[in-house]
Amino acid sequence: MSRRLALLGALLMGAAIGLPAQAIRGKVVEAGTGRPVSGAIVEVRGADGYLTKRVVTSATGGFLVPLSTGGRYRLTMRAIGFRPGTREAVDVELAVRTLPDLSLERQLFTLPDVVKFAGGSCVNAGTDRTAFAELLTAFGGALTVVEQAVAHGEITFETQVIERTVRGVTARQRRANPARTLDTIADTLHRPITNWPVHSLSVDSLKRLGFAVERWEDGQGSWTLYGPDPTVLFSPWFLETHCFSMDRPTPSADSLILRFAPRRRSQVGDIAGELVVNATDLAPRQLRFRFAYLPAALAGVTPGGIGGVLDFDREPGGIWYVNRWRVWSPTLSGRQRVGGTELEGRVVSARPDR
């Protein structure tokens, strides 16, 4: 019985939103200077606390949030390198409500300040847990800004995605050409990226199933491996079940590495990895992940041979995005590796949506 192993890199298409009569208009600026903060995430929640809309500020720091109904709303603003800000009790009637400028304070870190918190969330030695938790929150906020800017921003990122499949040749093919051991098939697609490029499951599903899920169809089993997204990486469940630590590559380096790994051995699929960020503002540079554990049914597969890398960049207008990514996994027949799949993508152009 054949089992296929594939790492999903699904990219979902977004839908355009119309402009109703009610809306909130505003501008996010840097406190003290008044400079516009582009690429900030603005979340609007209703009186019940549920998320109503999420938008990204433009190059001028402006935003317009269309609403389906009037009422009282609460705004939260997040941007890389800034402390989150809120605006309470924003009342909207049958009109566009224009707000005064919304200010965000800079949140800068110096290397000595950051490094003294290093040590990890699983050990006590020298770790200021309150400060470490604040840093983890900042890390998670930075990745969330990237994810939401891609999904809800005013920029369309066109990508080139190459899928390579490597598989072993048949015995007849080897007899005809003894030097031939592998076949490589490559497909190239061009499409917009409108979501986090590595597909994940909900936190509730990961709690039950892990990052490796077996599915059956027509008597044939296949395994699907999932990667992390910002919601998963910094969820209470992931923080409780994984160890986190920080280090600096060299004493003079301007970057920090946040490492994470399972707290204990897992009977389901689980991941480890690193997030590389700027030391001063915690802007993300790269996210690397790999499988640390796999289910017993995949005991013949090396977990570290499955994973991915995402590189981040900032476009001239200030929007942060995933610039390049690569994910890879083996292909199995039974419990033997017979090949592999690699998905490699990169942004080739960016244009305003309107």
Specify the residue positions occupied by each region the protein language model found.
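Conserved "repeat-terminator" motif of extracellular CCP/Sushi domains
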Residues: 91-94, 100-110, 114-118
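A short, Gly/Thr-enriched small/hydrophobic beta-strand-prone motif that recurs across taxa
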Residues: 19-29, 110-113
